[in-house]
Amino acid sequence: MKSETRFQILVSVAALGMSMLTGYAASQTPSNTLASPDSFASISDTGTRSAAMFTELGKVLTNPRCTNCHPAGDRPHQTDASRLHQPPVARGPDGHGTETMRCSICHGNANFDPGRMPGHPEWHLAPREMAWEGKSIAEICAQITDPARNGGRKVEDLIHHIGEDTLVGWAWHPGYGRSPAPGTQKEAGALVEAWVKTGAACPAK
């Protein structure tokens, strides 16, 4: 084998190996961290790269900090184990509770760690059309990209909602006794923005 041919083969093998390692690093990040959009640069197909970034974001969307307030029914869940809220409460007509049991009766403007009580000025449940408790990442993606099932929202709206909304941001600062969502809000926002800019493709499963 000529030295030039041998060199070309070695270069090709090395490039393939680096590509595989980069893809592995992006898809195998620990469950409590988030890969950056740059981690997916080795995926040449734009749609595949976009779907891969949403899959990474799915670590946040399927975390109890999110699913507890995006329930399939009208009762929120609580704790890392996603138990039904105690005392029993209901969504109510506006997501802020019933007339006699408003969320704000117990949930103040900020976390109250001595009582393990989470809080935020706008504490409430997500709208019914944004319920994704028990759904796969692919099903969540299909739902939030469909205006008929997401309250008429554009995918671009998610850049601000996930990346900057302070109630969503609570998920990364949930207070005593609760595990935060993976990564940081800034990292999640960067993934959403990159996902939208690459076509907002959904994973197949």
Tell me what each language-model feature is.
Residues 2-52, 64-68, 72-77, 193-205:
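Post-cleavage N-terminal segment of exported redox proteins
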Residues 39-60, 76, 80-96:
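Electrostatic cytochrome c docking/interface patches
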Residues 64-73, 100-110:
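The canonical Cys-X-X-Cys-His
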Residues 90, 99-100, 134-135:
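Short C-terminal domain-edge/linker segments immediately following a structured domain
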